[in-house]
Amino acid sequence: MKFTQTEKKQLMIYVIIAYGITYVLGLLMWYGYGKGLDLSAFPNAQMLYPAAGVMMAYLITRKGDKNLPKAFYIFFVALTAVLVVCTAASVLAPKNIDLMGTPFSQWMLILQYVMIGGSVIFWILLLVSGKEKRRAYG
């Protein structure tokens, strides 16, 4: 199977985002594990990396495509970046709060609120993008 230049570029962008960010934050995870910190924020952010990699690849390589739901893709990549920052902060500046007698990571709480708000905005952006764009890019 022979790949075009665009496909090679898309694959490289995907690999850098989906696996590169995972590797770099894995080092933070290792550090946090050694310190006994709460690492529950990591999987919440990590589940978005593959989709963010695909969306970033499309944003970079298909700039002229009118069917590309750009607002949705840009917001998804931006939200993923915010979650990466929250995840890194949960290890670099850990802070626990007390919720009904149970210690809970402040960053995990912030991350959950960001994901809830982001999900609502995702639905709005997806509905506003129109049927044609949704059909073209799933």
Regions found by a protein language model. Name each.
Residues 1-8:
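Short, Lys/Arg-rich, polar N-terminal cytosolic tail immediately upstream
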Residues 8-138:
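Specific transmembrane helices
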